[in-house]
Structures are given as structure tokens and as C-alpha cells.
Amino acid sequence: MAGHSKFKNIMHRKGRADAARSKLFSKLSREITVAAKSGVPDPNMNPRLRLAVNNAKAESLPKDVIDRAIKKSQMGDAADYSEIRYEGVAAGGVGIIVEVLTDNKNRAAANVRSYFTKMGGNMGATNSVAFNYDRVGQVSYPAKAASEDDMMEAAIEAGADDVVSDMDEEGEGHIVYTAFESLNEVAAALEAKFGPASNTKIAWRPKMQVPVTGDAVATLMKLLDALNDDDDVQAVYSNEEISDEDVAKLG
């Protein structure tokens, strides 16, 4: 799994380097607006909004931008966004789930489909990939936040289901998994002990990994990059496992 984690981290750094910071801020702002519109515009009374605001703060989204995104949800001319899940199979048999937040369903569907097609993949029907994933709550902390033992102990006390710690320099740090119904309670308990998380969300966790080697690795990465770079795409989940050797070839 080490190669898999490092591969994800390389993608993460590459995405940050290649994508404009404003694009990330736009996605965070959109989630805040939709979350506020789905309930009351008060993070203390709206769990989804609270998560969106906390994640935005973790990414250093300015407070005035957060406030504007919340106010925008209460305006009569605020765009109506649709939340859509697309699923497909990529090079090497990797199953991908794409979560979209869009004000134009036709545009989003056409774009996502084109990415899969151009990169040798195929779009699938709803649940054609999701059955290989679990819907979970996920709380992430950097490795420096705690030792493996301390994070495990705190997670167990908080009622979490599992902890994966990757303490390598290029690793993903601590990822705490919990039932999605318990996410807010677990996140609050961990925050009381370790401070704010780097990310807290409802996520898709793969039940099994699909080994990917050779040329399929680069093709897969191009697809994942294209999906993550799309303005309508909020999150992408995939179940590839890649060796350290193949990761090194990516440069």
C-alpha cells in the first residue's frame, strides 16, 4: 500500500502545482454555498455547512470569501446546483467514482464522459462501481499531528472504525474512518485532542485495490488529473494500487 499512498500524494502535489489556487477556492466556495442553501446558513446548526467551512479554513480560504459564499446561498438569484455521481472503469480495470456539483448537467455529463473515452476508459451505470466501495466518514491529519499509537487510541475512544497511518515523508499521514452517521461526533472528539483536521468529509472507501502497472499507470494519472481539474468535479475516488517502481517512473 505504500506505493499507492505515495502515488496519491504525488498527484496531490502535482495538482496543487498545476491548478490555479483560485480553482480550488472556487470549489470550496461552491460547496459552502450549496451546504448553506440545503439548510440554515449557520455552521453551528448545519452539520454539512460546518464541515464545508472547516475544510475551507484548512485550505486557507479567506474568511471574507467564506462569508460571501454563505450569503450567496440566501440570494434569490443564486444558481441551482445539482449533485451527481458518475461511475466508470479506467485503464487497468480501476473503478472510479466522480462526484459533481454543477449548474449544467449536460455539460458535466459530456465532459466526464469525454475524459473516460479519451483515456481508454468507459462510463458505467449507477452502482456499477460503487458496490466495490463503502460510504464512510473520513477525518485526515498530517503525520506530525500525532504518533500512530496516539492517533489509534484517540480514534478508538472517539468511536471510529479504522485508522490508516502512513508516516513516510511522502505519505498521507493519518486517515481515520468512521460510520458516516458518526462523522461529526468522531471529528469533534479528535479535534479536541489534536486540533482541527486537515480534511473531514463523507467519502467512498474502496473495499479492494486493483494493481496497475506499466503504461496503464500514466494513462490512469492523466484521467484522474483531467477529472480533478474540471470545474464541476468536487471529488474523485479510485481504487488503484501502484508499486513504488511505477510511481518513480512518473517523475
UniProtKB/Swiss-Prot annotation:
GO biological process, one term: regulation of DNA-templated transcription
Sorted UniProt keywords: Cytoplasm, DNA-binding, Transcription, Transcription regulation
MF GO annotations: DNA binding
GO cellular component, one term: cytosol
Gene3D superfamilies per UniProt: 1.10.10.200, 3.30.70.980
Name of this chain's protein: Probable transcriptional regulatory protein Caul_0780
SUPFAM superfamilies documented for this protein: YebC-like
Alphabetical list of PANTHER family matching this protein: TRANSCRIPTIONAL REGULATORY PROTEIN YEBC-RELATED, TRANSLATIONAL ACTIVATOR OF CYTOCHROME C OXIDASE 1
Keyword Cytoplasm attributed: yes
InterPro entries in the record: Integrase-like_N, TACO1_YebC-like_2nd/3rd_dom, TACO1_YebC_N, Transcrip_reg_TACO1-like, Transcrip_reg_TACO1-like_dom3, YebC-like
Family: Belongs to the TACO1 family.
Cellular compartment(s): Cytoplasm
This protein's record includes keyword Transcription: yes
